Amino acid sequence: MQGSVTEFLKPRLVDIEQINTTHAKVTLEPLERGFGHTLGNALRRILLSSMPGCAVTEVEIEGVLHEYSTKEGVQEDILEILLNLKGLAVRVAEGKDEVFITLNKSGSGPVVAGDITHDGDVEIANPEHVICHLTDDNAEIAMRIKVERGRGYVPASARIHTEEDERPIGRLLVDATYSPVDKIAYAVEAARVEQRTDLDKLVIDMETNGTLEPEEAIRRAATILAEQLDAFVDLRDVRVPEEKEEKPEFDPILLRPVDDLELTVRSANCLKAEAIHYIGDLVQRTEVELLKTPNLGKKSLTEIKDVLASRGLSLGMRLENWPPASIAED
């Protein structure tokens, strides 16, 4: 075996044993001693809790107001039906975060996932999955089902507080299991490379719900793990600096026209005659300057001072860089 004693062995995918369409065993080797458990446990946790997928989140059943009820002609109660709907394996086209599918069935017999009506963006991976049973020929059931894209497991109770208070009566929330991985286990066995016999072999045994192939699930889990570990490769401070909110150069009220002060006609006309068009122009004038304005007496001056004071302004203010470019261009 060539290479430095400090170099780590790089594992390779040795075998994929496809037991059926949803169950496979994936073997990787060789791994340095201890790395079998290190990588196996990390991948297992990601596969169980962090894989994105689609799940039923809401359902409306015709004639049903709440989950603690039954429906005539249906063998199961509503809670059992909701539990069965959690088992739907749904694949939704990329780019869509939520879709609605419908189910309408009548007549005695089982109601299965294959009875669901949907468009081309939706695929039911387990069409034989039983949702409920109708007990007589006159029985019928109709429901509207919401499917959303998400990650991990989100109980209905966690979404109650985020839903709108006006959520219609009869819209039932369902615990959402988004992860396409149903079961996952790993084992670490002995491996050998040339004269080294202290190496690990990692065997991952996984079952999915059919919306994702086991090999692809492991690939995605490894990608998630690698992306999370990227931060440890370069430990320099990579925090994004907070963007300081730029304060406007002038208080917006100063940029408003004098007409917004709703002065008397006499006072307003006097100011316009002196080319005082904006409140910012006005507050820079002193009382003495305004009293020199033709036809503007002490009564008008008092009115102007009172109106400015009601807005937290006064005469004789100094404004640097006035007027701003936007006004100067006008």
Curated annotation (Swiss-Prot):
One Gene Ontology term of the molecular function aspect: protein dimerization activity
Residue segments, region Alpha N-terminal domain (alpha-NTD): 1-236
Keywords: DNA-directed RNA polymerase, Nucleotidyltransferase, Transcription, Transferase
Any one of the GO BP annotations: DNA-templated transcription
InterPro entries linked to this entry: DNA-dir_RNA_pol_insert, DNA-dir_RNA_pol_RpoA/D/Rpb3, DNA-dir_RpoA, RBP11-like, RNAP_asu_C, RNApol_insert_sf
Source taxon at top rank: Bacteria
The EC number(s) this enzyme carries: 2.7.7.6
Enzyme class: transferase
Reactions mediated catalytically: RNA(n) + a ribonucleoside 5'-triphosphate = RNA(n+1) + diphosphate
Region (Alpha C-terminal domain (alpha-CTD)): 250-330
Cellular component terms per the entry's GO annotation: cytoplasm; DNA-directed RNA polymerase complex
HAMAP family linked to this entry: RNApol_bact_RpoA
Record's subunit section: Homodimer. The RNAP catalytic core consists of 2 alpha, 1 beta, 1 beta' and 1 omega subunit. When a sigma factor is associated with the core the holoenzyme is formed, which can initiate transcription.
Recorded family membership: Belongs to the RNA polymerase alpha chain family.
Domain notes: The N-terminal domain is essential for RNAP assembly and basal transcription, whereas the C-terminal domain is involved in interaction with transcriptional regulators and with upstream promoter elements.
Function: DNA-dependent RNA polymerase catalyzes the transcription of DNA into RNA using the four ribonucleoside triphosphates as substrates.
Protein name: DNA-directed RNA polymerase subunit alpha
Source organism per UniProt: Vibrio atlanticus (strain LGP32) (Vibrio splendidus (strain Mel32))
